[in-house]
Regions:
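Extreme N-terminal leader/targeting segments of oxidoreductases
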Residues: 1-18, 33-37
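Core beta-strand elements of the Rossmann-like FAD/NAD(P) dinucleotide-binding domain
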Residues: 14-16, 211-221
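Glycine-rich FAD pyrophosphate-binding loop
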Residues: 35-56
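Dinucleotide-binding Rossmann-like beta1-alpha1 core, especially the glycine-rich loop
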Residues: 59-145
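Helix-loop-beta segment of a Rossmann-like dinucleotide-binding subdomain
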Residues: 143-182, 203-205, 213-217, 290-299, ...
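C-terminal catalytic lobe of FAD-dependent flavoproteins
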Residues: 177, 235, 240-286, 292-365
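A conserved short coil-to-beta-strand element within the FAD-binding core of flavoproteins
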Residues: 187-202
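Flavin (primarily FAD) binding-site architecture
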Residues: 224-239
Length: 365
């Protein structure tokens, strides 16, 4: 991986087969794939690699259990396949990780539906290559695994498997792999314009945020992998505002592991038909996430008091003697999911929007 100054010098004098705008996990993956096939590739990122949504996750490589409720079976199976592939190809980055979904008293129908859903999830997982299966837990076993859960609230639970990773480390590993294949990567470079020649993007107009200098990069094709900033880059070509991406805000809070005693990660159903994760991470607990339409500054999403209170209330609904308060919160972070809004969809209802990837072939490719 060469120095930034050398990468800048190369960018000024070369014509690349592909310029990738965006240094998150999507841009890194595109660059790695293209470079491994022999293309000359340049990745441009306006801040740190992985600084956006890619570093604001719940650290999970999950198969999309909650997507089954929306009947997204094909997506769930695809996610399970990708999860198993990552575990096989990058065991130093992705490892098996188990969760417990508690069953609540007086909610027999939901408990049965959840058990059936996890059974289907296991079936999809097995067809994707995993051999493990879920396990039903009685109240005593669940109490030993997660003492903070109230025995008057929960009646047992079910244990299932997913995977976990360090999201930022994952991005940097893929970036470095792309470099090993010959890609050039530069951070702190802002894209200010896209020049067209014969109906195709031929130059990317850039601004070095360190030196303040402007320069252009010649290319044969360009990929916009900027997540929630997708529309900003697309509009550099079209010249007119067009909304393809709807940002959905996901907030997490962090509390000390001593504040809520659990020896396992939890997958908590909520009263508003969502799910909240409680994930042990680096001697602390991450609790999240929310899923709400966002209209604020996409460059600096912050957790709000209402969002933190919501997450606290979900966890507290499962406990009695280990109730959490704002005083227990040692940190928080928020990220924005770039969801594709299809014609006729309600932008406010982000939880119903598909998590599938779509590729738009814009004028100027």
């Amino acid at each position: 991986m060469q120095s930034r100054s050398q990468s800048l010098a190369d960018a000024r004098k070369r014509k690349y087969d592909l310029v990738v705008i965006g240094g998150g996990i999507t841009g890194a993956g595109v660059a790695q794939n293209a470079a491994s096939r022999g293309l000359s590739v340049l990745v441009i990122e306006k801040t740190d690699f992985g600084a956006g949504t890619s570093s604001k996750t719940t650290k999970l490589i999950h198969g999309g259990l909650r997507y089954l409720e929306q009947f997204h079976f094909a997506l769930t199976r695809q996610l399970c396949e990708e999860r198993e592939r990552l575990k096989r190809l990058a065991p130093h980055l992705v490892r098996d990780f188990s969760f417990v979904l508690p069953f609540t008293r007086g909610n027999l129908f939901f408990n049965m539906k959840a058990a059936a859903g996890i059974g289907l999830y296991d079936l999809l997982t097995m067809t994707a290559g995993r051999t493990g299966s879920h396990a039903h837990l009685n109240k005593k076993t669940l109490s030993q695994m997660s003492p903070a859960l109230s025995s008057t609230v929960v009646s047992g639970g079910i244990k299932f498997h997913d995977a976990i990773t360090d999201d930022t480390r994952m991005v940097l590993s893929v970036i470095k792999s792309a470099c090993d294949y010959g890609a050039t990567v530069i951070n702190y470079v802002q894209v200010n314009g896209l020049k067209m020649t014969d109906g195709r993007i031929s130059e990317v107009e850039c601004h070095d945020r360190f030196s303040g200098e402007d320069f252009s990069v010649a290319c044969r094709a360009c990929v916009n992998a900027t997540g929630v900033w997708t529309d900003e880059i697309c509009n550099l070509v079209s010249g007119s505002p067009e909304q393809r991406v709807t940002p959905s805000k996901g907030t997490h809070i962090v509390v000390p592991s001593s504040a809520f005693e659990t020896n396992t990660a939890l997958f908590l159903p909520t009263k508003d038909r969502r799910f909240v994760f409680v994930v042990p991470w680096l001697r602390a607990l991450m609790i999240g996430t929310t899923d709400d339409f966002y209209t604020g500054n996409i460059n600096h999403p912050l957790a709000t008091a209402d969002e933190m209170d919501y997450l606290l209330s979900v966890v507290n609904s499962y406990t009695e003697s280990h109730r959490l308060s704002r005083r227990d919160i040692t940190g928080s972070f928020a990220g924005l999911r770039p969801l594709v809004r299809l014609p006729g969809q309600d932008a406010d209802n982000t939880s119903s929007m598909s998590r599938e990837h779509l590729i738009f072939e814009a004028p100027g490719k």
